[in-house]
Swiss-Prot record:
Primary gene name: VPREB1
Keyword GTP-binding applies: no
Listed PROSITE patterns: IG_LIKE (PS50835)
Annotated spans, Complementarity-determining-2: 71-81
Biased composition (Basic and acidic residues): 121-130
Region (Framework-2): 57-70
GO CC terms in record: endoplasmic reticulum; extracellular region; immunoglobulin complex
Region (Disordered): 121-145
Organism: Homo sapiens (Human)
Signal peptide: 1-19
Protein name (Swiss-Prot/TrEMBL): Immunoglobulin iota chain
Length: 145
């Protein structure tokens, strides 16, 4: 396998968090093809990530953003349509962080990745939100060139 870097640019969005930026992501990350990378989305300390779902989106060059996944807890999460299981979410409540892990990095993973925080919702509301987000997504963005 040849070594090729994958660069990730991170942007964040938080609904209902007020006018000040409350999320932080490193501006870019890179890793070799075939490896696993973990993107971090950190919520400011005066907010509690434990009460939010973490949403992740991907935008490839020349394409609109697409919903990847929502993660609230190991027992309360959802994957976007046709999103492979090598994309997975997690949270570290003690560090106030959400994570997106991408295993077996592939060339097509080069994209912008968006992180967003939102209130926990029911499965029905989640399906409706996914449909709306596919039509007009609102999320933070991370670029993987």
């Amino acid at each position: 396998m040849s070594w090729a870097p994958v660069l990730l640019m991170l942007f964040v969005y938080c609904t209902g968090c007020g006018p000040q930026p409350v999320l932080h992501q490193p501006p870019a990350m890179s890793s070799a093809l075939g490896t696993t990378i973990r993107l971090t989305c950190t919520l400011r300390n005066d907010h509690d990530i434990g009460v939010y779902s973490v949403y992740w989106y991907q935008q490839r060059p020349g394409h609109p953003p697409r919903f990847l996944l929502r993660y609230f807890s190991q027992s309360d999460k959802s994957q976007g349509p046709q999103v492979p299981p090598r994309f997975s979410g997690s949270k570290d409540v003690a560090r106030n962080r959400g994570y997106l892990s991408i295993s077996e990095l592939q060339p097509e993973d080069e994209a912008m990745y968006y992180c967003a925080m939102g209130a926990r919702s029911s499965e029905k509301e989640e399906r409706e939100r996914e449909w709306e987000e596919e039509m007009e997504p609102t999320a933070a963005r991370t670029r993987v060139p």
